[in-house]
């Protein structure tokens, strides 16, 4: 399983989001990803050490982001779309992060919320990605390049 994930990571990092819209492009890709996600085990013991290795990275990156914007954890979904998120940061210097639907098998709630802040800042603000499949895949690719190698 670890070798499969390593090879997948190499592929995804080199993937340039060149799929075309339509039933044999993005739609099919999203369908395949959703099917793979649905078939995957909810918990994989072999992933625990990788998530544990990410915790110092999460703390470090979160501190950097806090130095740039006021991160506020909220018990709601504060933004309808990525444009609203970017406008809030631009106009108010505030990045609201939802703590709803945030259960994680390995990260504690605080670490998971910090990781969400990193995701939103690095992806939706710095890379200008949307809250759609293409934007989230681009976000995932960006995250992979910054994660610790373990």
Where are these regions (language model features)?
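Glycine-rich short-loop/terminal segments
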Residues: 14-107
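Compositionally biased, intrinsically disordered low-complexity regions enriched in proline and serine
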Residues: 12, 30, 38, 120-122, ...
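Core of folded catalytic or high-affinity ligand/protein-binding domains
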Residues: 71-150
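Short acidic, low-complexity intrinsically disordered linear motifs used
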Residues: 1-17
């Amino acid at each position: 399983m670890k070798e499969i994930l390593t090879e997948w990571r190499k592929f995804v990092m080199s993937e340039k989001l060149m799929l075309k819209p339509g039933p044999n492009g993005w739609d099919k890709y999203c369908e395949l990803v959703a099917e793979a996600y649905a078939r995957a085990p909810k918990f994989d013991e072999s992933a625990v050490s990788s998530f544990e290795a990410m915790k110092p990275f999460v703390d470090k990156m979160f501190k950097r982001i806090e130095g740039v914007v006021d991160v506020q954890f909220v018990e709601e979904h504060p933004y309808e779309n990525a444009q609203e998120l970017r406008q809030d940061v631009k106009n108010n210097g505030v990045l609201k992060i939802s703590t709803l639907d945030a259960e994680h098998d390995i990260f504690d709630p605080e670490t998971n919320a910090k990781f969400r802040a990193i995701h939103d800042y690095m992806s939706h603000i710095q890379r200008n990605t949307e809250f759609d499949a293409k934007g989230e895949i681009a976000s995932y690719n960006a995250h992979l390049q910054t994660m610790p190698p373990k």
